[in-house]
Amino acid sequence: MPIGVPKVPFRNPGEEGAVWVDVYNRLHRERLLFLGQGVDSEISNQLVGLMVYLSIEDDTRDLYLFINSPGGWVIPGIAIYDTMQFVPPDVHTICMGLAASMGSFLLAGGEITKRLAFPHARVMIHQPASSFYEAQTGEFILEAEELLKLRETITRVYAQRTGNPLWVVFEDMERDVFMSATEAQAHGIVDLVAVENTGDFA
């Protein structure tokens, strides 16, 4: 039987009694954000709104974005990425499970030196895809042009964030490239790999 989102006790400052809030609301108060699904407009708007609100509330405390995502839509993902660069606090990115496609793009978009992968996490990069088979001829041409622009944008961001030459990133994105946490670190997508059973980083 589904139990829904777990609830945890939370005590507001100055109040004696605790109230029960869902676990994500409680974690948001600690500036911990979660992308645990495919990227779409709804989750993009939620994360953008949270980052902006938390930045207004306190622009000196870092934000932490935990990622376990198979990827998703390009434009909503770019909206999250741009917001991460725009808000004053540094945004740490943490890969747990899988960061694929747009998930890996957002992982790389964290503050450089503050991007982390758990030891058994997987990362995958590839070029943006499209639903060409649904388009008419004229739409196909326009969509192809737009897709090329998006691919160039994403490739340049990867090159900037990883320190790899543009041609290396371009070749890597020709196909699905899966990486372990240490391979993602060598590739420049993350800066640190968490060490098991300790609070330290490698």
From Swiss-Prot:
Belongs to the peptidase S14 family. It catalyses: Hydrolysis of proteins to small peptides in the presence of ATP and magnesium. alpha-casein is the usual test substrate. In the absence of ATP, only oligopeptides shorter than five residues are hydrolyzed (such as succinyl-Leu-Tyr-|-NHMec, and Leu-Tyr-Leu-|-Tyr-Trp, in which cleavage of the -Tyr-|-Leu- and -Tyr-|-Trp bonds also occurs). It is an enzyme of class 3 (hydrolase). Gene3D superfamilies: 2-enoyl-CoA Hydratase, Chain A, domain 1. One of its GO terms (biological process) is protein quality control for misfolded or incompletely synthesized proteins. Its EC number is 3.4.21.92. One of its GO terms (molecular function) is serine-type endopeptidase activity. Coiled coil: none annotated. It is found in: Plastid, Chloroplast stroma. Component of the chloroplastic Clp protease core complex. The lineage of its organism: Eukaryota, Viridiplantae, Streptophyta, Embryophyta, Tracheophyta. The active site is at residues 101, 126. Cleaves peptides in various proteins in a process that requires ATP hydrolysis. Has a chymotrypsin-like activity. Plays a major role in the degradation of misfolded proteins. Keywords: Chloroplast, Hydrolase, Plastid, Protease, Serine protease. Its main location: plastid. Pfam families: CLP_protease. It comes from Illicium oligandrum (Star anise). This is ATP-dependent Clp protease proteolytic subunit. GO terms for cellular component: chloroplast stroma; endopeptidase Clp complex. HAMAP family: ClpP (MF_00444). The keyword Transport does not apply.
